[in-house]
Curated annotation (Swiss-Prot):
Protein name per Swiss-Prot or TrEMBL: Fatty acid-binding protein, liver
Protein's organism: Ginglymostoma cirratum (Nurse shark)
Cysteine-cysteine disulfides: none
Pfam families in the record: Lipocalin (PF00061)
Modified residues (N-acetylvaline): 1
Keywords: Acetylation, Cytoplasm, Lipid-binding, Phosphoprotein, Transport
InterPro entries: Calycin, Fatty_acid-bd, ILBP, Lipocln_cytosolic_FA-bd_dom
Annotated localization: Cytoplasm
Amino acid sequence: VEAFLGSWKLQKSHNFDEYMKNLDVSLAQRKVATTVKPKTIISLDGDVITIKTESTFKSTNIQFKLAEEFDETTADNRTTKTTVKLENGKLVQTQRWDGKETTLVRELQDGKLILTCTMGDVVCTREYVREQ
């Protein structure tokens, strides 16, 4: 987990609007969300991980222990049962709600944080660079 710690700024995004459509995010929310460049801050206190996402649109904050299910309220106001696991050096976050499921995988590639979001057959990638 230590390699993920720090502050990350969104640099580029691919297929985010399609991904949000699959989540049933409203057109107005999608328009705003695709224009902002959020910052993600990942920290660790003992065995509790915090992932804070900050933007001018909406900020979220989740705290969890690896492999323990918790209740999450997402940026688009879904209430999910969420689990985060460390698998092959990747942080794999699974959100479940209303019989649906989406997966958010965070991994490090060439010093960048790559977030791959999958919902059904739609895959979105978001690339973050470490802030100094």
